[in-house]
A protein has these predicted regions:
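Conserved Nudix-box catalytic region and its N-terminal flanking loop in Nudix hydrolases
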Residues: 47-88, 92, 183-211
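N-terminal strand-loop-strand
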Residues: 17-18, 22-65, 79, 94
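A short coil-to-beta-strand element that immediately follows conserved catalytic motifs
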Residues: 93-101, 218-220
Length: 263
């Protein structure tokens, strides 16, 4: 019988305690659980990029995949597993990590029934330091692009197509991007992609929105919405300084109130 907090609380009746002591945990087959992380960031050209790892073992040996791994049963939660895997692959500890969806098709992994809890991690521009984990041959940041055949992932190492990815990871990535495009219209997700959340211009935030949405936005309307939703509500505060750009712009600071919304 597992020593859970409920058992230690002393709230069990003698009958329930006897039931738990005699319970056979092998009565039902159990799937394994993995945490897979869609790690998104921006390159210097403000293009949306994703971290992929090249698998070093079977199945799908040599194929590109999302960073992730098995949850250590009885030792961590699936969210803790996602944070651990993200840190092992990137060295990032404080990313905006959000649960995306649970993928549980019984045939998604040729080894056994594996349930994947997928997460989206938004990494500030310029802060992603790639390092392949123990079970990967390589790790690379790819630019996400689209052509007539669908989504591609491009880097100096070549072009990877959706169908070239391991498992059902193309489906996971598509869902993550679709969800981000929806959320960015009403949630502060874009702030987590800023290079410096403590000192940024409206134009930087607008560029991120345009990249995610893949469309041009009107600056006047964007500024109006930004001031209304963030400055007037105290979630962002103006700084008494301007940027060093050719046309200096007012700089802003993301407050702790807005940071706590992501915790």
């Amino acid at each position: 019988m597992r020593e859970s907090a409920y058992l230690k609380s002393g709230q069990l009746s003698a009958e329930e305690k006897a039931f738990l002591e005699s319970y056979d945990p092998e009565k039902y087959k159990k799937p394994s659980v993995t945490a897979d992380v869609v790690t998104l960031t921006l390159n210097p050209e403000d293009q949306l990029c994703i971290l992929l790892i090249k698998r070093g073992s079977y199945p799908y040996k040599g194929k590109w995949a999302l960073p992730g791994g098995f949850m250590e049963t009885d030792m961590e939660s699936v969210t803790q597993a996602a944070k651990r895997e993200l840190y092992e692959e990137t060295g990032v500890k404080d990313a905006s990590l959000r649960q995306l969806y649970t993928f549980s098709d019984p045939d998604r992994d040729p080894r056994m029934h594996v349930v994947s809890v997928a997460y989206t991690a938004l990494i500030p521009k310029g802060s992603l330091r790639v390092r392949a984990g123990d079970d990967a041959w390589d790790a690379e940041v790819f630019r996400i692009a689209y052509d007539v055949d669908g989504m591609t992932f491009q880097s100096e190492k070549g072009i990877v197509r959706e169908e070239d990815l391991a498992f059902d990871h193309a489906r996971i990535i598509r869902m993550a991007i679709k969800r981000l495009r929806s959320r960015i219209k009403y949630e502060p997700d874009a702030f987590w992609l800023l290079k410096n959340k403590k000192e940024f211009a409206i134009s930087e935030l607008k560029a991120i929105h345009e990249t995610i949405l893949n469309e041009k936005l009107d600056l006047a309307n964007f500024r109006k919405a930004f001031l209304r939703d963030y400055v007037e509500t105290g979630r962002v505060k103006p700084l008494n300084k301007k940027s060093n750009a050719k046309r200096p712009a007012m700089l802003y600071d993301m407050t702790e109130e807005l940071v706590e919304e992501e915790i």
